């Protein structure tokens, strides 16, 4: 991605919601590499899909020769950002936040190159400058530059002030000052001149721009990426089970891959622009090919492959594809013990059972059948498989060889209804 027209290229991909002084920023980028940053607050023990677009934007800038700073908010995570939140966040302990900081720093690291010369990425933590700051310094050196009149008129805060059931605490109201000071600090330490973030961060970003100008007399810029929406109006990045996380222990690579496979045709080509590094020409060619093929579109598989590889690496992608193929074909011989652990985590419904159970009881306990009577009929009708093998004996008791790796048995009713037994 060439640096001189980087903003235009991001706009072509639909990746720019708002930008401050676009012309001046384009000029600054044309002069040579800049340092830029994006902040990630540790509000949970993992990043989720909502963080992926700004994180990949940092990567896009680095690929164009710029220096990314990934800021993990060890201090701001203790306070909580009120922007567009309906209610006050629960405050977490310092120990919890520190634990989450470490996890998020490790999650961010694989997306950026920390050893590539001049534009090597930097990992920063705002606890480094806020941890020992006293309240008088905060109020005198930072607070005096902020107008409360302007702060209460910011859209992100106004919504909370206008709610009768939920006001805003001074703690959360102060968040804007903390994030603003982050920008000024990073400008002084690393020469950072651009902050990127989600569109909900616009108010915090512009505060940082104003504060940096007042404290250091430097012109800096802000760019927000859009809130990702789905064509049908439902929320992006959520499943029935909740958020889709980047941590494989919270959302398995298989489940992650399946999330992208299930992308609607109306969204898939847009998402390829947001979440992959394919060129616009490649994406348009794929769309044209899908339109004219007369078959099921290929785009969902391309999207799932590209994003799963980005987040979980080649091994994670291959495991996800292997599990998908085995569930489709019914042959489980290629699955490893780790693959079954992914299925047990969130891949298919799971039930724990004591050894000595019979098949009818397993079908009832797994909710594949409502009663033993119904289970008997279903088994007799040849509609049940155990580890991919048909079983038509209603009196069947599980054998040791049915317990793969001594732990797992996969039941299937019909073509698509699965349950994994984890033996105690």
Swiss-Prot record:
Gene: tyrS
N6-acetyllysine modification, residue list: 144
Oligomeric and partner information: Homodimer.
GO BP field: tyrosyl-tRNA aminoacylation
Binding site for ATP: 238
Reactions this protein catalyses: tRNA(Tyr) + L-tyrosine + ATP = L-tyrosyl-tRNA(Tyr) + AMP + diphosphate + H(+)
Species of the source: Escherichia coli O6:H1 (strain CFT073 / ATCC 700928 / UPEC)
InterPro entries: aa-tRNA-synth_I_CS (IPR001412), aa-tRNA-synth_Ic (IPR002305), Rossmann-like_a/b/a_fold (IPR014729), S4_RNA-bd (IPR002942), S4_RNA-bd_sf (IPR036986), SYY-like_C (IPR054608), Tyr-tRNA-ligase (IPR002307), Tyr-tRNA-ligase_bac-type (IPR024088)
Binding, L-tyrosine: 37, 175, 179
Protein name as catalogued: Tyrosine--tRNA ligase
Primary role: Catalyzes the attachment of tyrosine to tRNA(Tyr) in a two-step reaction: tyrosine is first activated by ATP to form Tyr-AMP and then transferred to the acceptor end of tRNA(Tyr).
Record motif 'KMSKS' region, residues: 235-239
Pfam families with a match to the protein in the record: SYY_C-terminal (PF22421), tRNA-synt_1b (PF00579)
Gene Ontology MF: a single term: ATP binding
EC number(s) stated in the UniProt entry for this protein: 6.1.1.1
Keywords of the record: Acetylation, Aminoacyl-tRNA synthetase, ATP-binding, Cytoplasm, Ligase, Nucleotide-binding, Protein biosynthesis, RNA-binding
Signal sequence annotation: none
Family annotation (NCBIfam families): tyrS
GO cellular component, one term: cytosol
Subcellular location(s) of the protein: Cytoplasm
């Amino acid at each position: 991605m060439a640096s001189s027209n980087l903003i235009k290229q991001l706009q072509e991909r639909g990746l720019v919601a708002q930008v401050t002084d676009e012309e001046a920023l384009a000029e600054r980028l044309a002069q040579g590499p800049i340092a830029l940053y994006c902040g990630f607050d540790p509000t949970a023990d993992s990043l989720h899909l909502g963080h992926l677009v700004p994180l990949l934007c940092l990567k896009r800038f680095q690929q164009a020769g710029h220096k990314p700073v990934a800021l993990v908010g060890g201090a701001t995570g203790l306070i909580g950002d009120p922007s567009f939140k309906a209610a006050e966040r629960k405050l977490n302990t310092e120990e919890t936040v520190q634990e989450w900081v470490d996890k998020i720093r490790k999650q961010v690291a694989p997306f950026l190159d920390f050893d590539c010369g001049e534009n090597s990425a930097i990992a920063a933590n705002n606890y480094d400058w806020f941890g020992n700051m006293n309240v008088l310094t905060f109020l005198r050196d930072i607070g005096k530059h902020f107008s409360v009149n302007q702060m209460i008129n910011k859209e992100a805060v106004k919504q909370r002030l206008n709610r009768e059931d939920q006001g805003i605490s001074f703690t959360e109201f102060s968040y804007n000052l903390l994030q603003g000071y982050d920008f000024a600090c990073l400008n002084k330490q690393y020469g950072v001149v651009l902050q990127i973030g989600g569109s909900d961060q616009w108010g915090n970003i512009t505060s940082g721009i104003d504060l940096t100008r007042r404290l250091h007399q430097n012109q800096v810029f802000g760019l927000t990426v859009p809130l990702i929406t789905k064509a049908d109006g439902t929320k992006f990045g959520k499943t029935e089970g909740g958020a889709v996380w980047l941590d494989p222990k919270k959302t398995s690579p298989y489940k992650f891959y399946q999330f992208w496979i299930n992308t609607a045709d109306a969204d898939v080509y847009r998402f390829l622009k947001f979440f992959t590094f394919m060129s616009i020409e490649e994406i348009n060619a794929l769309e044209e090919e899908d339109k004219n093929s007369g078959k099921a579109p290929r785009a969902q598989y391309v999207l799932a492959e590209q994003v799963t590889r980005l987040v979980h690496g080649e091994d994670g992608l291959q495991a996800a594809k292997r599990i998908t193929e085995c569930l489709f074909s019914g042959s489980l011989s290629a699955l490893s013990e780790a693959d079954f652990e992914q299925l047990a985590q969130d891949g298919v419904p799971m039930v724990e059972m004591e050894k000595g159970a019979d098949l009818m009881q397993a079908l009832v306990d797994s909710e594949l059948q409502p009663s033993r009577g119904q289970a008997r009929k279903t088994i007799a009708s040849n509609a049940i498989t155990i580890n991919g093998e048909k079983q038509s004996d209603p009196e069947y008791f599980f054998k040791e060889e049915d317990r793969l790796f001594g732990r797992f048995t996969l039941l299937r009713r019909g073509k698509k209804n699965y349950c994994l037994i984890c033996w105690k």
